[in-house]
Amino acid sequence: MTHTLRVIFAGTPEFAAAALAAIHEAGFPVPLVLTQPDRPAGRGMKLQASAVKRYAVEHGMTVAQPPSLRRAGKYPAEAADAIELLRTTQHDVMVVAAYGLLLPQEVLDIPRAGCINIHASLLPRWRGAAPIHRAIEAGDAETGVTLMQMDVGLDTGAMIEEARIAIAPDDTTATLHDRLAADGARLIVDALVRLERDGTLPATPQPADGVTYAEKIGKHEAALDWRKPADVLARQVRAFDPFPGGVATLDGAAIKLWAAEPVAARGTMANAAPGTIVEAAPEGVVVACGSGALRVTQLQKPGGKRLPAREFLAGSPLAAGQRFALPDVD
């Protein structure tokens, strides 16, 4: 089916690319795609295009990559050029998903139907940059995707629609991301169909209660503090997969932990100091925590690959009594 509603799309990572693909495949014209500039990535630190740019180029879409959309920012000339491009590109609505750049009021006012954001949380919980990570880390039972009419605040716009999903006990940010991306893609296509048909999308202001913020994930958060309860550390490991990983330091080597589950402390395990390896078996490496213990079932040594505990121990033996370092506490 071919639609007449013209959509400018702004987004950067895979989460956004799923939405762009759905919009394109549904038959909506996309006269312009905005995405962040290419960034150095990988071991060779070569410039790499975003997932959104790769999809857009592959499908013959016009792409712009301004470093900023704020005239008062570090790149006023580039911002002015991008804003002029938005003004001269005929369109009806802008869809924004994990774009990574702030949209000033001047930009929000350009599309006739405004700017619709796809946000990976149940707003107003987890406004901000890392809603998927923080939902898992906090032990939330459910999360979802919210469509909102954007304003200049940080994810404060009126809500158009949401979809809820349960967070499974073994969900990682990677697995939850993929399900949320699919839901976001479905929601935005449905919303655009209604917007084209009705000319408007009713929206409800966000409640004042229940606001939390999902701060951007920093590499400094990767270090596991074994003084914490085992269930908290297990959530951290799941939340930080695929980035930045949970890091445990042993004899100066940073070992990444990719899969772990809390287990009850039994016998002498209950008296072991936090960070102490109490068992190193093919089924997993069990480490004493502030309360309970953590069975680690997937590990990665520096420069190596993710391996099940059995394979990791075959090449890098660990033994009961060894102790992972405790990070400094601010």
Swiss-Prot record:
Gene that encodes the chain: fmt
Keyword annotations from UniProtKB, A to Z: Protein biosynthesis, Transferase
InterPro entries referenced in this protein's UniProt entry, alphabetically: Fmt (IPR005794), Formyl_trans_C (IPR005793), Formyl_trans_C_sf (IPR037022), Formyl_transf_N (IPR002376), Formyl_transf_N_sf (IPR036477), Formyl_transferase-like_C_sf (IPR011034), GART_AS (IPR001555), Met-tRNA-FMT_C (IPR044135)
Catalytic activity: L-methionyl-tRNA(fMet) + (6R)-10-formyltetrahydrofolate = N-formyl-L-methionyl-tRNA(fMet) + (6S)-5,6,7,8-tetrahydrofolate + H(+)
Organism domain of life: Bacteria
Entry-linked SUPFAM superfamilies: FMT C-terminal domain-like, Formyltransferase
Function (record text): Attaches a formyl group to the free amino group of methionyl-tRNA(fMet). The formyl group appears to play a dual role in the initiator identity of N-formylmethionyl-tRNA by promoting its recognition by IF2 and preventing the misappropriation of this tRNA by the elongation apparatus.
Entry GO CC: cytosol
PANTHER family, sorted: METHIONYL-TRNA FORMYLTRANSFERASE, METHIONYL-TRNA FORMYLTRANSFERASE, MITOCHONDRIAL
PROSITE patterns reported in the protein's UniProt record: GART
Molecular functions per Gene Ontology: methionyl-tRNA formyltransferase activity
GTP-binding recorded as keyword: no
EC number assigned by the record: 2.1.2.9
Protein name: Methionyl-tRNA formyltransferase
Alphabetized Pfam families for the sequence: Formyl_trans_C (PF02911), Formyl_trans_N (PF00551)
Family: Belongs to the Fmt family.
Binding site for (6S)-5,6,7,8-tetrahydrofolate: S121, L122, L123, P124
